[in-house]
Amino acid sequence: MSKRHPVVSVTGSSGAGTSTVKRAFEYIFKREGITPAVVEGDSYHRYERGAMKEAMAAAVAKGENFSHFGPDANRFDKLEQLFSIYGETGGGEKRYYLHSVEEAAEHNSRFGTSLAPGQFTPWEPIPAETDLLFYEGLHGGVVGEGYDLRKLADLLIGVVPIVNLEWIQKITRDNQERGYSAEATVDTILRRMPDYINHICPQFSLTDINFQRIPTVDTSNPFFIQTIPTPDESFVIIHFRKVARDKWGINFPYLLDMIHGSFMSTPTSIVVNGGKMGFAMELILTPIIHRMIEDKKSIS
């Protein structure tokens, strides 16, 4: 952890809503005049798309579980190194994973390369004179044998829907965006399950703040293609670790007054309508980030 070069980490599985948090942070950074060094979690995967398929096929042939959720498919060492070096110096290295033809064209023009979607760009230095590091991905607080990213994050945010909702989103979006059948996606869920249990879920016991979306419609059977519950058909439980609540001085009466229809379910949790999730994030996170930057300025 570092007051001079803070690390903010948002962790959650694919489709969990981390993009909503990312947008909230973007608004905060713009309003506060903050320049972040932004790092995407999938750029620290171990394999490019083709190599990942080969590694997965080899693991399946051996009867082994292998997925992007686990350590064997990721460079936790490089990510931990980035968090550590940034906290010490404000520097480090990052790269990009190319998701689309458009992204590939953008970065090929920068590097003079001919990379395709599914490949990584070369490693490059973090831009100089950034105010903080912002990570968004699967493993922002992962802890295991030989690595501990949690201890290096100054603020760790978890974004995790209730598991039936997560599966509904995964199955339905894979069908709509990739043409996968429900059965094919269920096979993926089953293959990933050991890594999900051992490497994704434990992070949410270590976060400073968790945002958990809970649907208010029937999601009893998530294993078929169906309509994804809308934000207004959901609640979001916002849980604060006691240490984080005390450290950041979370003002619950203020939040209850500002967020219509919100209520406290426990002394450390507030519940809001799903449609208010982004607004709640900005109310909660703006003073935290502001204080981080003020602390940074006080020792610079």
State what each model feature region is.
Residues 115-128, 132, 149, 163-300:
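C-terminal accessory "lid"/substrate-recognition subdomains
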Residues 142-147:
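Conserved ATPase-coupling elements of RecA-like P-loop NTPase cores
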Residues 12-13:
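P-loop (Walker A) phosphate-binding loop of NTP-binding proteins
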Residues 21-22, 26:
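Post-Walker A alpha-helix
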Residues 34-40, 44-109:
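Conserved nucleotide-sensing/catalytic segment adjacent to the nucleotide-binding pocket
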Residues 18:
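Conserved lysine of the Walker
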Residues 1-5:
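Phosphate-binding P-loop
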